[in-house]
Curated annotation (Swiss-Prot):
Top-level taxonomy: Eukaryota, Viridiplantae, Streptophyta, Embryophyta, Tracheophyta
Subunit structure: Homodimer.
Stated name of the protein: Gamma-tocopherol methyltransferase, chloroplastic
GO CC terms, sorted: chloroplast inner membrane
An individual GO BP term: alkaloid metabolic process
Underlying gene: TMT3
Record organism: Catharanthus roseus (Madagascar periwinkle)
Keyword match Lipoprotein: no
Transit peptide limits: 1-65
E.C. no: 2.1.1.-
């Protein structure tokens, strides 16, 4: 029987670190995490309180405050230095954080798919991550027929290879995964060897904006929650299309901001401010909408373009990640992992806030390359 998670007792005081003078959503955090007790909290524009669970928490807060970096504003017009800086940050973030994620959540580094309103355990969350893969395949009408199923698959932004190995087993397919993180690529390959898949699955460090594959190589092009890291969304999509074989299916599951109304030219200032804070910690360039992706696909004459907002189906995910981080195992692993991971953990409540305010959308976009 598995041991129950150990949460910090209610007497432990947890304050909210306020980066750039912005208050995290205390009410949403409390509603999701009843085991946590917040200290008396009176919002001001100048306080920079920190988690006070450890004696050195002030040092942690000072380091976090010092690490607040400018938002990456990369528009794809040749800002090579900024792109390199962004990609270096992404690689280092995942080099540092992938181990703790695997230890607590397993080898699938993405949201789960849940029935709305359900209460789920950690085991259910891992099942939900597999369901996310299956729901995306179903939405894209990927066939299980032995004569029609994909035989060559690329996993763009593969993490530690959870999806790639799943596809290799499900379809008996050859799978290639790419990531910016050397740590992820090495771990993904080690897991493939451990599962006896080294002959069909391989991983390498590569840039999704310049994939190391020839034209038209893959029957299924898969991108699970990597598009949000791409500084040039059009170039990213063009590369997905380039490596896709004629008739191939392309699946993009990604974070987007809400679609703009016909009268809007941009998000509201407070919405953009929220996203900027998330960008700072997760090494994200400027966000785009689902409609922006669709326009790119239409401009490239892709067929059977479909889109859906699955935000309601991923609602339990971020509260669950916060809960797992606040178990003794999760918290001590987090503290050991490094500053980039700690910084990322501190903005998790902003993801909850962004979804609740309908600023953030969890989007799935699929299409087919013409024959």
């Amino acid at each position: 029987m598995a041991a129950a998670p150990v949460f910090f007792p209610s007497s432990v005081v947890v304050s909210v670190y306020r980066a750039h003078g912005y208050a995290f959503s205390c009410s949403s955090l409390l509603s999701q995490l009843p085991a946590i007790k917040l200290s008396s909290y009176r919002p001001t524009r100048t306080d920079h309180t920190a988690i006070t669970l450890l004696p050195n928490s002030n040092r942690i807060a000072s380091r976090l405050q010092a690490m607040q970096s400018p938002t990456f504003e990369v528009n794809g017009d040749g800002k090579t230095e900024e792109v390199e800086k962004l990609q270096k940050g992404i690689a280092e973030f995942y080099d540092e954080s992938s181990g703790i994620w695997e230890e607590i959540w397993g080898d699938h580094m993405h949201h789960g798919f849940y029935d709305p309103g359900t209460t789920v355990s950690l085991a259910d969350h891992r099942t939900a991550q597999i369901r996310m893969i299956e729901e995306a395949l179903r939405f894209a009408s990927v066939s299980d027929d032995p004569m029609k199923k994909p035989k060559r698959i690329v996993d763009v932004g593969c993490g530690i290879g959870g999806s790639s190995r799943y596809f290799a087993r499900k379809y008996d397919a050859e799978c290639k995964g790419i990531t910016l993180s050397p740590v992820q690529a090495k771990r993904a390959q080690a897991l493939a060897v451990a599962e006896g898949l080294q002959g069909t699955v391989s991983f390498e460090v590569a840039d999704a904006l310049a994939q190391p594959f020839p034209h038209g190589q893959f029957d299924l092009v898969w991108s699970m929650e990597s598009g949000e890291h791409m500084p040039d969304k059009e170039k990213f999509v063009r590369e997905l299309v380039r490596v896709a074989a004629p008739g191939a299916t392309i699946i993009i599951v990604t974070w987007c901001h809400r679609d703009l109304s016909p009268s809007e030219h941009s998000l509201k200032p407070q919405e953009q401010k929220l996203l900027n804070k998330i960008c700072d910690s997760y090494y994200l360039p400027a966000w785009c909408s689902t409609a922006d992706y669709v326009k790119i696909l239409e401009s490239l004459f892709l067929e059977d373009i479909k889109r859906a907002d699955w935000s309601e189906y991923v609602a339990p995910f971020w509260p669950a990640v916060i809960r797992s981080a606040l178990t003794w195992k999760g918290f001590t692993s987090l503290i050991r992992s490094g500053w980039k991971t700690i910084k990322g953990a501190m903005v998790m409540p902003l993801m909850i806030e962004g979804f609740k305010k309908d600023v953030i959308k969890f989007s799935v976009i699929t299409c087919r390359k013409p024959e």
